Amino acid sequence: VLLPKQHILLLSHMRAYTSLFSHIIGSNPAVCGYYEMHIGYHSWRSLLRQKLLYFRDEEVKTGFSCMFDKVLHNDHAVSPSVLLRPNTRTIFSLRHPRDTLPSIVTLYQQVDPTNEFNSPDYALDYYVNRLTALSGIATNIEQPFYYLDAEALVENAGECLGSLSDWLR
């Protein structure tokens, strides 16, 4: 159980259809993980920690071979050494700010009116800082990664998921 063959990490930002993506990939019987663990990945030990935390609350799928997680915040660092592991696959996904920023503000106005994300300026700072961090990560890994246009997941799901499936094989 503690040694799946593969890890998939989605590196993105809030409101980029990552929940949709997570439910799609998590519906695969070979994949365990469909929600954000809210942890960093600092070394290979973090991959083990992910499994321990996940299986504390979730059942092991029969025949699973892959763990999935998404990292959406700079508070949860991801080390290049983790992304460079031969059994780790990295997916980056971005959504256009024109749609992302109002979506962040609207969400927090509904769920927590006192949250800082109610401010368009705060949401913009988060988005810019997150994209800067993602750019730095992408620049520093020498292993191929997959870029998923968040809008394509909704607007052209079949082609998008087909391409991703081919890449994951």
Where in this protein do the model-derived segments appear?
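Generic signature of intrinsically disordered, low-complexity segments enriched in small/polar residues
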Residues: 20, 24, 37, 44, ...
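PAPS-dependent sulfotransferase catalytic domain
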Residues: 73-169
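Glycine-rich phosphate-binding loop used to anchor ATP phosphates in small-molecule kinases
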Residues: 60-80
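PAPS-dependent sulfotransferase catalytic core
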Residues: 1-65
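A general marker of short, structured functional hotspots
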Residues: 50, 69, 122-123
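Short beta-strand segments
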Residues: 10-12, 67-70, 147-149
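A generic secondary-structure signal marking the coil-to-beta-strand transition
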Residues: 6, 64-67, 89-90, 144
